[in-house]
Amino acid sequence: MKFNKISLSVSTALLAAGLAVSGSANAKGRLVVYCSATNILCETTTKAFGEKYDVKTSFIRNGSGSTFAKVEAEKNNPQADVWFGGTFDPQAQAAELGLIEPYKSKHIDEIVERFREPAKTKGHYVSSIYMGILGFGVNTERLAKLGIKEVPKCWKDLTDPRLKGEVQIADPQSAGTAYTALATFVQLWGEKEAFDFLKELHPNVSQYTKSGITPSRNSARGEATIGVGFLHDYALEKRNGAPLELVVPCEGTGYELGGVSILKGARNIDNAKLFVDWALSKEGQELAWKQGDSLQILTNTTAEQSPTAFDPNKLKLINYDFEKYGATEQRKALIEKWVQEVKLAK
């Protein structure tokens, strides 16, 4: 496949809560966004959309798993219009449960063909706005202090006893990043071998974080030697000066598709459709790396990629099965098994 300052008026309290508002007092309606991307991308995206279309736009930021739980809890009284960012699977699961409104964007034909398929398969409930490569980042300075000379290159290198308490990965109950990792291991090796690996990895994990982004920040600061997650988060930390080496594991790896969808019962449906169109457009996607400090691979074929974006054609990627691993029962079963056999196991 080929991939060819206006200030935001918002109170400190709202920013601390992860909610921002943009648009004029006489705006053409409203839009409430549940956002599972980074806080800066959430803020940049909603601000730019609100200013371009004169829509009073607000967002609440949470991880994909937490947002899914919120959307499900609010199904009889939806509090938002759009779900933007984060991994595709939870949004696909929400669609399966009737929590997402189908919408085929006018920009769908500009999206990389293979990335249109999840949307088509699910009935155009969720559209793909970016791709993120799963891997890990290694703090080389902290690794050297452990007396380890060679940077780990494979998933199974992370089970090295010398790395006890030195690895961080998110919790799949709250973070779509971690569920993507879990589903990737199962697709790489089969369920039994995948869970054997996770059990062997467990003593080396210092923390299962709530957010998938946190391990990148903690490894960048030297609070962990290795963080598992999407490599664009680690690329940003490295660009900012962190002593990180980014690793695409030797066995192969999976990837996320960042999703955007309209919530069932959206009160501002026309603005929600407009937002999805904009998020899939060249302009909306390029905003991610030009202003939003997000270095994912963009899915719009007309969009300019970040100079640091990976070329997926050169990576050893699995054929990630979004249909199977985005299904409600499959996702629920894998997460429950992980909780019982890994996280809570003695």
Curated annotation (Swiss-Prot):
One GO term in the molecular function aspect is: thiamine pyrophosphate binding
Keyword set, alphabetical order? Signal
Signal peptide coordinates: 1-27
Gene Ontology biological-process annotations: thiamine transport
Write down the superkingdom of origin.
Bacteria
This protein's GO cellular component annotations are: outer membrane-bounded periplasmic space
Name-wise, this protein is Uncharacterized protein HI_0131
| Protein's organism | Haemophilus influenzae (strain ATCC 51907 / DSM 11121 / KW20 / Rd)
Coiled-coil residues are none
